[in-house]
Amino acid sequence: MFHLLTNCNVCSHCLRELDAKFISFKVGKYKALAIYEYDDRIKSLLYQFKGCFDIEIADIFLIRYVRELKIMYEGYVVVPIPSYKEDDEIREFNHVVEMFKILKLKMAPLLIKTKKIKQADRSLKERQEINKYLELTNQTELKGKKVLLVDDVYTTGSTMKAAINLVEQCHPKKIEILVMSKSPFKDLKEE
């Protein structure tokens, strides 16, 4: 289904290190696809990208599969899961936007995170409260559109579910999810 690009500017050693899994799953009733399983290699590359502000490696995560992903999601509006604004300002880029802009699909960063919280540092119960800290800035832009929610790592699903709840209020034609990686942890169950 997917092929390897050979004419890219990313180190071939780094590309070989990435082992795509193409994990299909559901978030509620919505189809989702994760390209990689979240493992030590992905964790290390994400740290280099986000933590060390290495924007030059933004393309490494998706470059091998751009053609196929563009075909799969043609006509979708890409809505990235947000970072806290101040974190983006320190980094001088939004890592999710930079990671997915290689797809050259319409990007609509309409979600904002209103408080600096790191999901990884929170308990499962606290993670479910993420909806208190996400807002949608424009409800009309997504009405009747095919929406692709994108993120770097899908762990428990709390953030994605909160984003879906906001996007559903816009009455989109369709919602799908694409994440660069998925943690092997189970999703939080609806209570």
Over which residues does each language-model region extend?
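PRPP-dependent phosphoribosyltransferase catalytic core
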Residues: 162-191
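Short, well-ordered alpha-helices that flank and scaffold nucleotide-derived cofactor binding pockets
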Residues: 67, 98-105, 161, 165, ...
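Structural beta-sheet core signal
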Residues: 80, 109, 149, 177-179
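Residues at the starts of beta-strands that form the adenosine-phosphate
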Residues: 106-107, 146, 173-176
